A protein has these predicted regions:
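N-terminal/domain-start alpha-helical segments
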Residues: 1-103
């Protein structure tokens, strides 16, 4: 399984990547909207772990673009935004799950 972790906070991104690699997943990472967009366009992922607030753009915009392209990647949002409205918005846009930070 190939996973893309999109998170701008370096230490959190590294912890997530290491944890997934320890479970023997193939993991790549991106720290900005642009870097994530390029990787998503160039590679197929089975799962994308996606922060909402990114330098250069919103993770929700990436989510909308992925779903508009009918990409079937599993998408898990990770965000410090923890209101019911934020969670409903993410799930309504096509996320498969929504996890709040810290976790």
């Amino acid at each position: 399984m190939k996973i893309l972790v999109v998170e701008d906070e370096n230490s959190l991104r590294e912890v997530i990547v290491r944890s997934l690699e320890k479970e023997r997943y193939v993991v790549e990472s991106a720290s900005s909207f642009r870097e994530a967009s390029l990787k998503i366009n160039d590679y197929d992922y089975d799962c994308i772990v996606l922060d909402i607030m990114l330098p250069g753009g919103s993770g929700l915009t990436l989510l909308k673009e992925l779903r508009a392209l009918r990409k079937k990647d599993s998408i898990i949002i990770i965000s410090a935004k923890d209101s019911i409205e934020d969670k409903v918005t993410g799930l309504d846009l096509g996320a498969d799950d929504y996890l709040t930070k810290p976790f």
